[in-house]
């Protein structure tokens, strides 16, 4: 089973990706991880990508697509794979299609922006340990204080409301065209990837079940 998983920051995509990968015995593949491994190992594509990154440039879609095609030939992809954060653009999606990289499902975890903002801007962190709390869902025993050390909790800059809103704007600008692309393809071609939206509100198990039901309904 070959899956593309989409979802905004704070939607719980990482947790659900792990659940899907465990259920179907497939690897979770992100372009960031692929780039790091290729650069570390020193593959031809990795060397090429490193030169570009060292000069401050952006790695081209062509290199990314070739890394993806190389990665999915590995033995751990025999049952399929899950793309996390890829494709990001219509160009990348069309390159996958042109190169006949089979995708069975495109699953989008949908969470309203206000819920995402509440989830992320409510986080409070103990910087030394990395322990994370939430002002609503996982409160410390004493407001603003780490349970273990008694030290002050902080809101990381990444979790500020303005930063979260900015990240959501970027996500929507990137993702909505992709969703439209896959929906349009599915409407025209019975062999196209099946697109489904799963509401990402509720318990982790409730969201997991919605995703599994989407996959089963098209199986």
Swiss-Prot record:
Q: Where in the cell is it found?
A: Cytoplasm
| Naturally occurring in which organism (per UniProt) | Vesicomyosocius okutanii subsp. Calyptogena okutanii (strain HA)
GO BP term, pick one:
AMP salvage
Residues of the region (NMP) are: 30-59
Q: InterPro entries this protein is in?
A: Adenyl_kin_sub, Adenylat/UMP-CMP_kin, Adenylat_kinase_CS, Adenylate_kinase_lid-dom, P-loop_NTPase
Main enzyme class: transferase
What is one term from the GO cellular component aspect held by the record?
Answer: cytoplasm
Protein name stated in the entry: Adenylate kinase
């Amino acid at each position: 089973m070959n899956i593309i998983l989409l979802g905004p920051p704070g939607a719980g995509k990482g947790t659900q990706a792990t659940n899907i990968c465990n259920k179907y015995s497939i690897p979770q593949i992100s372009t960031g991880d692929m780039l790091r491994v290729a650069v570390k190992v020193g593959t031809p594509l990795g060397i090429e990508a490193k030169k570009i990154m060292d000069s401050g440039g952006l790695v081209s879609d062509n290199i990314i697509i070739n890394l993806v095609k190389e990665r999915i030939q590995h033995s751990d992809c025999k049952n399929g794979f899950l793309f996390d954060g890829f494709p990001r653009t219509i160009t990348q999606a069309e390159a996958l299609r042109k190169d006949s990289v089979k995708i069975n499902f495109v699953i989008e975890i949908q969470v309203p922006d206000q819920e995402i903002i509440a989830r992320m801007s409510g986080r409070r962190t103990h910087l030394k340990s990395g322990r994370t709390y939430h002002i609503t869902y996982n409160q410390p025993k004493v407001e603003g204080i780490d349970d273990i050390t008694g030290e002050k909790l902080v809101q990381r800059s990444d979790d500020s409301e303005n930063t979260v809103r900015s990240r959501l704007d970027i996500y929507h600008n990137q993702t909505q065209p992709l969703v439209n692309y896959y929906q349009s393809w599915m409407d025209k071609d019975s062999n196209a990837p099946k697109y489904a939206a799963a509401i990402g509100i509720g318990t982790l198990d409730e969201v997991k079940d919605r995703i599994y039901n989407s996959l089963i309904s098209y199986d």
